[in-house]
Each structure stands twice: as structure tokens, then as C-alpha cells.
């Protein structure tokens, strides 16, 4: 729940900035910032978390089952973003309206999928996302294996088997202490901060083009690299902080969960908002942006599939982000 709240309010800022940019007709900036947020969370945030956490704890673990489910969801997001662009590139005579209709239909599907993932993680299969429960189940499974071995020895030395068997029994009276959840005040603080950001976002959007020209940067680099890093700095710091506290499950849920929410919620909502604001917003991204997203998803899935991380894996993610950032910087 903590990771979901952090991701939701963090992406609320992203959504507000994107809505203001969309209202001003800056469609290229909106799409670039969406692509950059996905790339930044998967490579920069997760890379920093694994690298700094790995330097302190040598090796850290998180739930591989959740990592694989997140990987499948990200693969779906890549497919959903790729197909409208692929159709536009491979078919002739496709107008803006047809592209918008396809993007709207895809947006509805993605929002529905995200709703189902919330139902899966918070209702029907909560035990898979509870780190404490998962660890306990792993210990029980190991205990069952050890118990079988002890019983085999017990056929030869019953006395010894009994003493070891008793050690494997779990005291039913031992229950984890429950602490009251006082999250309501903090939700209010996050909500107030989000509202404050809404007022400041308009000034950011208005000064974006002028600042880009003064710094001599191309719009693609600004939208994909600079804007997401600045807009999600607090969320990035939280994920890294959790890794430094050896809470890698929460760190991964913030990094990957944020990317999923952007791909499955924020982007579709912006497509639907385009109809209301009278802007031709669709999911037809630049091919180079899609290649960068696909590369980010591929390397992140490869590294996180085993549910274990170290500083070298974090360094690999950071190196991939640096290569992509340089590519966007020199992109004409």
C-alpha cells in the first residue's frame, strides 16, 4: 500500500504537468515526458537503488514472482505503445482521426488491465505482494523439507528426531505485532503538496521552450531526460532511500510500479483528455522513443527476474540509461 500511494501521488504530478502541456498543444513534450518517465524509473531509479543498496548490503532480495508479473505487464505496455506507431508507419492513408480512435480503444483496454492488476494485488492474491508472508511461506517450505529429512533419521534414532522435530514446530502464540496505520494525515500532506505542484506546473510548462533554446538542447532530450528527472526527483529519492534501508521490495515496487502506472494509466488518461481539450493526443510515439522504452523493459526484466540484486546489476542499468541519454542528446 505504501508503494502504491507513493507512486500514485508521484505520478499525479506527472499527470498535472502533462495535462497543462497538452492544453497548450505541446504534444511532443507530453509524449517525450511519458517515455522518459518510463525509461527513468526502470533504468535510473532502479539502477541507483540496486547500485547503492548493493554497496551497503552486498546482495539484496525481492519477490521474484512479483518481478515476473511486473515484467509481463511491462511487456503488454510496450506492445500497446508499439502497435499504433507500427500501424502508422506501415500503412498508408492513415489520418489523425483513425490514429486517435485506435489509441482511444487501446487506452480503455490499458486502464481496464491496470484495474485488474490492482484487484489481483490488493484483493485476490495479496499474499504474493506481502514480503513478510512470502518470507514466512518460504521458511515453512524449507521447514517441511527439513522435517522430511529428520523423520527419515528418526527411523534410526527416534530420540534425536523428536528433539529436532520439536524445533521445527511453530509456536501458534507467536504472532507478529500489529501497529496501527496512521496514514490519513500523510495522505493529506501528499494531497496538499500535489495541489501546490498543480499551480507551479503551469509556470514550468510556459518556460520550458525558452529554457530549452537558451541551453542549446533539443526538445527530445529535454522531454525524455530532463523533465522526468526534475518532476519525479522526490519519488526517485524515496525509492533509493528504501534500498539503503534494505527494503528492496518497496524500492522495486516504487520504480517498476511507477512505470506501469504511467504506461497503463497516465498515458491512456491523456489520450482521453485529448478529446475533452480538443487536442489530437494519441499513442503514436516517435520510433526512437519506442526503441528506448523496449530496451529499458528488456534489460530491466532480464536483471530483476531472479528476485536478487547487487551493485553490478545496478551499474548495468545506470550504464544503459547513460547510453540512452547520450543518444537522445545527440539526436538531431
Residue ranges and their predicted role:
Residues 2-54, 222-279, 295:
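Helix-loop-helix junctions within the multi-pass membrane cores of secondary transporters/permeases
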Residues 212, 260, 321:
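Hydrophobic, well-ordered secondary-structure elements that form the walls
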Residues 4, 8, 26, 30-31, ...:
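Generic hydrophobic-segment detector
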Residues 28, 42-206, 281, 285, ...:
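Alpha-helical transmembrane bundles of multi-pass secondary active transporters
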Residues 193-234, 238:
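Long, well-ordered mid-to-C-terminal structural blocks that present hydrophobic/aromatic surfaces
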Residues 273-274, 285-287:
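A long, glycine-enriched binding/interface module in the latter
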Amino acid at each position: 500500500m505504501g508503494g502504491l500511494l507513493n507512486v500514485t501521488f508521484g505520478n499525479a504530478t506527472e499527470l498535472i504537468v502533462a495535462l497543462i502541456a497538452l492544453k497548450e498543444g505541446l504534444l511532443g513534450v507530453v509524449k517525450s515526458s511519458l517515455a522518459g518517465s518510463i525509461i527513468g524509473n526502470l533504468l535510473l531509479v532502479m539502477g541507483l537503488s540496486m547500485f547503492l543498496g548493493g554497496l551497503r548490503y552486498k546482495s539484496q532480495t525481492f519477490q521474484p514472482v512479483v518481478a515476473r508479473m511486473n515484467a509481463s505487464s511491462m511487456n503488454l505496455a510496450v506492445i500497446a505503445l508499439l502497435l499504433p506507431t507500427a500501424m502508422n508507419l506501415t500503412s498508408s492513408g492513415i489520418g489523425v482521426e483513425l490514429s486517435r480512435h485506435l489509441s482511444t480503444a487501446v487506452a480503455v483496454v490499458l486502464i481496464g488491465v491496470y484495474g485488474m492488476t490492482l484487484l489481483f494485488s490488493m484483493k485476490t492474491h495479496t499474499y504474493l505482494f506481502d514480503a513478510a508472508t512470502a518470507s514466512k511461506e518460504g521458511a515453512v517450505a524449507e521447514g517441511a523439507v527439513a522435517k522430511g529429512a529428520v523423520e527419515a533419521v528418526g527411523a534410526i534414532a527416534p530420540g534425536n528426531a523428536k528433539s529436532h522435530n520439536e524445533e521445527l514446530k511453530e509456536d501458534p502464540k507467536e504472532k507478529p505485532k500489529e501497529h496501527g496505520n496512521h496514514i490519513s494525515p500523510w495522505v493529506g500532506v501528499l494531497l496538499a503538496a500535489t495541489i501546490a505542484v498543480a499551480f507551479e506546473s503551469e509556470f514550468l510548462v510556459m518556460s520550458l521552450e525558452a529554457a530549452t533554446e537558451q541551453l542549446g538542447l533539443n526538445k527530445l532530450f529535454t522531454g525524455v531526460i530532463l523533465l522526468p528527472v526534475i518532476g519525479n526527483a522526490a519519488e526517485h529519492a524515496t525509492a533509493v532511500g528504501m534500498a539503503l534501508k534494505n527494503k528492496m521490495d518497496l524500492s522495486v515496487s516504487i520504480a517498476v510500479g511507477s512505470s506501469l502506472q504511467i504506461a497503463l494509466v497516465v498515458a491512456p488518461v491523456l489520450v482521453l483528455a485529448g478529446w475533452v481539450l480538443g487536442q489530437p493526443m494519441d499513442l503514436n510515439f516517435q520510433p526512437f522513443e519506442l526503441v528506448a522504452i523496449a530496451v529499458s523493459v528488456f534489460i530491466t526484466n532480464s536483471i530483476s527476474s531472479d528476485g536478487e540484486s547487487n551493485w553490478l546489476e545496478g551499474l548495468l542499468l545506470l550504464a544503459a540509461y547513460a547510453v540512452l541519454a547520450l543518444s537522445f542528446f545527440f539526436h538531431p
